[in-house]
């Protein structure tokens, strides 16, 4: 699918996909393009597109480079999968002959939000670099919202976990905590990747003054968000350690109970074993009150360590 946009009255407007209109486009957004659409761009605009496999490369030389096909940036965008778990999608940006090409394999919130804003938002420079920076700016705003949501969720999780009551809510809090840790790690990767992409863009291109300042402003926003995200990691680790501590305490209580019970019944077991031996010519075997005496000894043998443990404060 090809979403083509041109400039009209300093605003982005969507245009048809026929070849004539594509020549006037400033932004070509390709969402899972078919083979025919790739060939159309190659024949009409002379632009070859990267494969989705190439988008998975993580080394800097494969994500940020410049060649005869233009300036290339591959950047991660935060999204959620069909199960609402945090995920990252890699988007290829190519700028050539004043035209921006974006290649992605799924719909992304940042792109959807920017398209909605572009209906009323005017462009200052009306060029492809401004569209690129606006998309990055929208992405950082989205990441800031994600960080704020994690903060709010961790506040609720703190109350449940630090309460120490291990119930169904405690188990659910642990599951949510692991999800938040995964989300925070993906946000950190996205911030670092965007920082590298913008750094490459600033070094390799001669941006107009306004756009250069916009790029630097985005970089400052990233630098301000990174400490917040790191503090989230620390809080997640603290809550995880606290939860593990409460679990260990509960397990120790259980082991302590079984240990005390085993010690309590060990003397009684010894008495029962001794009483149960059947040897001839032993006067105890013919003692009239031998059975109640043995029962009494067993009870006394069990109560004695119990009372001793209680006085020591071990129970």
Swiss-Prot record:
It catalyses: Mg(2+)(in) = Mg(2+)(out). It is found in: Cell inner membrane. It is a multi-pass membrane protein. The record marks 252 as: Essential for ion permeation. SUPFAM superfamilies: CorA soluble domain-like, Magnesium transport protein CorA, transmembrane region. Pfam families: CorA. Gene3D superfamilies: Magnesium transport protein CorA, transmembrane region. One of its GO terms (cellular component) is plasma membrane. A motif (Probable selectivity filter) lies at residues 276-278. Its main location: membrane. The chain crosses the membrane at residues 257-277, 289-309. The central ion permeation pathway is formed by the first transmembrane domain from each of the five subunits. Mg(2+) binding strengthens interactions between subunits and leads to the formation of a symmetrical homopentamer surrounding a closed ion permeation pathway. Low Mg(2+) concentrations trigger both a conformation change within each subunit and a loosening of the interactions between subunits. This results in an open ion conduction pathway. In addition, this results in a less symmetrical shape of the whole complex. Homopentamer. In the absence of Mg(2+), interactions between subunits are weakened, and dimers, trimers and tetramers can be observed in vitro. Belongs to the CorA metal ion transporter (MIT) (TC 1.A.35) family. NCBIfam families: corA. This is Magnesium transport protein CorA.
């Amino acid at each position: 699918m090809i979403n083509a946009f041109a400039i009209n009255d300093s605003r982005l407007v969507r245009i048809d996909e026929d070849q004539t209109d594509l020549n006037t486009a400033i932004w070509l957004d390709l969402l899972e393009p078919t083979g025919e659409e790739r060939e159309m761009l190659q024949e009409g605009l002379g632009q070859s597109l990267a494969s989705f496999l190439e988008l998975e490369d993580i080394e800097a030389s494969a994500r940020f480079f410049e060649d005869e096909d233009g300036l290339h940036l591959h950047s991660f965008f935060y999204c959620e999968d069909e199960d609402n778990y945090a995920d990252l999608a890699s988007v290829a940006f190519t700028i050539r002959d004043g035209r921006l090409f974006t290649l992605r394999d799924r719909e992304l919130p940042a792109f959807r939000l920017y398209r909605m804003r572009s209906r009323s938002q005017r462009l200052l420079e009306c060029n492809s670099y401004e569209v690129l920076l606006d998309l990055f700016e929208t992405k950082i705003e989205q990441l800031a919202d994600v960080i704020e949501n994690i903060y709010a969720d961790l506040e609720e999780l703190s109350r449940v976990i630090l309460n120490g009551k291990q119930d169904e809510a405690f188990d659910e809090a642990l599951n949510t905590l692991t999800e938040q840790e995964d989300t925070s790690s993906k946000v950190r990767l996205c911030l670092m990747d965007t920082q590298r992409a913008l750094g490459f863009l600033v070094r390799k291109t001669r941006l107009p003054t306004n756009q250069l300042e916009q790029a630097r402003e985005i970089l400052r926003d990233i630098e301000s968000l990174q400490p917040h995200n790191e503090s989230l990691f620390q809080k997640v680790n603290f809550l995880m350690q606290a939860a593990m501590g409460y679990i260990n305490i509960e397990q120790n209580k259980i082991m302590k109970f079984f240990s005390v019970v085993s010690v309590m019944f060990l003397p009684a077991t010894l008495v029962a074993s001794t009483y149960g031996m059947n040897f001839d010519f032993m006067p105890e075997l013919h003692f009239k009150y031998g059975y109640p005496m043995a029962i009494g000894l067993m009870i006394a043998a069990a109560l004695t360590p119990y009372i001793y443990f209680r006085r020591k404060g071990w129970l």
